[in-house]
């Protein structure tokens, strides 16, 4: 059974059977996180980082140390920086860049384009596919036309989209991205109302997405849905 749990901000936990995949794991400094870092001790298999801003890189290094068998999936440039800076072993790294799928323990992973900034590598989105379900996590991004290609190539069932504005898409722009991506089962807003700088009314996103004929799914921090 595939499940998705939103942990507040951009942090997202995907579960496929007994495998746990976390994306952009800011936990300790996340005022919306429903769990403490210890919750993940020996409980993660794959850690995905879309880019190196602190609210997305988050607790990645500590989580890798708490989960010796876990693998890091990010751009190779970012992985190399983290490996050199924090002495992360090569065995913990899945080398990758924007492109096709890499399969790890039956879970298919890919990185996509994102329009944002990042110090040690280009920013990305992420695709996770297993058990017949495909999830697109857009990372931090503005609206860009190639989102249509992401939808056509990966055909996501669910799209997690930042809507907080200022640093990423706002609700209106995110609703346009839904039209481009065409998620088959739902569009999930993330990266909003964590702090005042990205405070928006999520109902604006809901109304816009519904009016375009798609299914908005608003989660509370800690809420789990079956995919």
UniProtKB/Swiss-Prot annotation:
UniProt keyword annotation of Transcription present: no
Pfam assignment, any one: Lactamase_B_2
Example of a GO MF term: hydrolase activity
Keywords: Hydrolase
Keyword Mitochondrion recorded: no
Disulphide bond pairs: none
Matching SUPFAM superfamilies: Metallo-hydrolase/oxidoreductase
HAMAP family attached to this UniProt entry: UPF0173
Similarity-based family: Belongs to the UPF0173 family.
PANTHER family in alphabetical order: UPF0173 METAL-DEPENDENT HYDROLASE MJ1163, UPF0173 METAL-DEPENDENT HYDROLASE MJ1163-RELATED
Protein name in UniProt: UPF0173 metal-dependent hydrolase SSO0099
Originating organism: Saccharolobus solfataricus (strain ATCC 35092 / DSM 1617 / JCM 11322 / P2)
Organismal lineage: Archaea, Thermoproteota, Thermoprotei, Sulfolobales, Sulfolobaceae
